[in-house]
Amino acid sequence: MSQSVSLTFPDGSVRSFPAGATGRDVAESISKSLAKSAVAIAIDGGVRDLSDAVTDGKIEIITRKDPRALELIRHDAAHVMAEAVQELWPGTQVTIGPVIENGFYYDFAKNEPFTPDDLPKIEKKMKEIIARNAPFTKQIWSREKAKEVFAAKGEQYKVELVDAIPEGQDLKIYHQGEWFDLCRGPHMASTGQVGTAFKLMKVAGAYWRGDSNNAMLSRIYGTAWADQADLDNYLHMLAEAEKRDHRKLGREMDLFHFQEEGPGVVFWHGKGWRIFQTLVAYMRRRLAIDYEEVNAPQVLDTSLWETSGHWGWYQENMFGVKSAHAMTHPDDKEADNRVFALKPMNCPGHVQIFKHGLKSYRELPIRLAEFGLVHRYEPSGALHGLMRVRGFTQDDAHIFCTDEQMAAECLKINDLILSVYEDFGFKEIVVKLSTRPEKRVGSDALWDRAEAVMTDVLKTIEAQSEGRIKTGILPGEGAFYGPKFEYTLKDAIGREWQCGTTQVDFNLPERFGAFYIDSNSEKTQPVMIHRAICGSMERFLGILIENFAGHMPLWVSPLQVVVATITSEADAYGLEVAEALREAGLNVETDFRNEKINYKIREHSVTKVPVIIVCGRKEAEDRTVNIRRLGSQDQVSMGLDTAVESLALEATPPDVRRKADAKKAKAA
């Protein structure tokens, strides 16, 4: 057995340490201050306890400033919260408490569920525990000891968790003072390193193991950050997000609603449907030159989904349907008992369209697009306005091309996606390549080729953007049928939304026997590229509403102008103004009610009308208009013709304006 361990440091230097040396020993060998600020170590990228013995490899000392420390802070905060709860309410059982995005939660078995009023008490107790600065220490227990100890404490859920751990796997028990828990780790050095930049956010109910047949537990959500400034920024972002909640704004703007009879499907009101159709019309114009729009059936026999693999891989997310008569008359032997499925994706239908008729290599690439309504089952608790629904429209396209055309097609798709996002005002975009997962179809040679091409494409995207577009790699995150690009955009308050995707597919063309005739008159399987820009049109609309806080750009707004009169003497002129704006292509309503003008302005501001034109006796005499913008107290007076021309230009979609500008430039 080696008497020393060889460690490579970030600066490239290599040092030897005696076998059994811990991460803390290594940190202390560098400096006392580093040892004091260290919270963990990483060996070859794997995060470990500071008290763990080091092994040969590349070592990093992790401090609170390291992004990786955030998960440790949140993990430890969850343990501190669990201890606080059991100190305050003895007899409460702890179950599981993972780190989640922006925070953590812990589920408890308690006779009476927690209320929001309990949270300040728990926070106070947590601060006491943190102030004790008890060290986290790890022990390895036998399965028998763990079950015996937890059973004696009345922790039946922990006994069940112990039983679920595979035989031969270590059972780690972490102590913080007298309190302990079953946990895989790692943890920081002590409770004091959690700090005080945390907040408990809300309480909720949750079924044990997410199964509605099991007991209902009481869940507490919390958030924790490296410092108070980060916590304050996060809480400010949440407050902003609450103001911008598309569900609230959707009601105020009269765009859509949901109801019990149709969980997860949208009831579009007139104004909401107008925005939806504006988005679809915009996307149709962007696709008109390069894509052929098609429409595949929504209901198809399960045999097709068995061939595609969805019935095996994706069945739990699908809706199965059959004749209502067959369902209500199971004993009727004459009933049609075929089982169909509502399509969860458009791709199998597009393969059928590609296969219909012989295709030559000269015809490739063939680009098929569809605004396809798809249905996917989501648990009722996961549904969230337009962001998480059961029925939605995908701006889907599938490109069938040769292997040699793959790179050019991916770049062409990238240019389109970035251009669309820019038209909606999104400037900060991240493009990441997701590579092969462990479970996948296709040979390694196919994956090697596809990943090599897409890696080169990613480099080209980064180079062409001159630093504007950030790129990255997501190892093992690809789909089972091929690598993919994921496009993430950042909104006005800093939240990130993954929207667009470009996915190479080795699976469906092979499963369905799709082919084209190549230059040697041989049958050849095409490369299939899945492409979505918005992803879900409903979700993208929800993102737009929240990004703009309901203050939609004029070209997107369902109602662009309200003409409001101060006095009935100006009504005739108000009608003339409204008609002139309509003739210029704007969506206009009039408000000639016998109400004070400030009341009218407030009312239309609540519904987020972007432009209110005020007309009184003076404006009628001078043939002018008084323009008031949403969110501004300023008023601008201008001549009617000038106002119509200016607003018509502003209401012109950006792609239409570019085309007109290019035409003018060419004519000049």
Curated annotation (Swiss-Prot):
InterPro entries in the cross-refs: aa-tRNA-synt_IIb, aa-tRNA-synth_II, aa-tRNA-synth_II/BPL/LPL, Anticodon-bd, Anticodon-bd_dom_sf, Beta-grasp_dom_sf, TGS, TGS-like
Reactions that this protein is recorded to catalyse: tRNA(Thr) + L-threonine + ATP = L-threonyl-tRNA(Thr) + AMP + diphosphate + H(+)
Biological processes per GO annotation: threonyl-tRNA aminoacylation
GO (cellular component) term, any one: cytosol
PROSITE patterns: AA_TRNA_LIGASE_II, TGS
Predominant cellular place of this UniProt entry's protein: cytoplasm
GO molecular function terms attached to this record: ATP binding; metal ion binding; threonine-tRNA ligase activity; tRNA binding
Residue ranges, annotated region (Catalytic): 245-553
Pfam families named in the record: HGTP_anticodon, TGS, tRNA-synt_2b, tRNA_SAD
EC number: 6.1.1.3
Chain ranges of the TGS domain: 1-64
Subunit structure comment from the entry: Homodimer.
Protein name, entry field: Threonine--tRNA ligase
Gene name for this UniProt entry: thrS
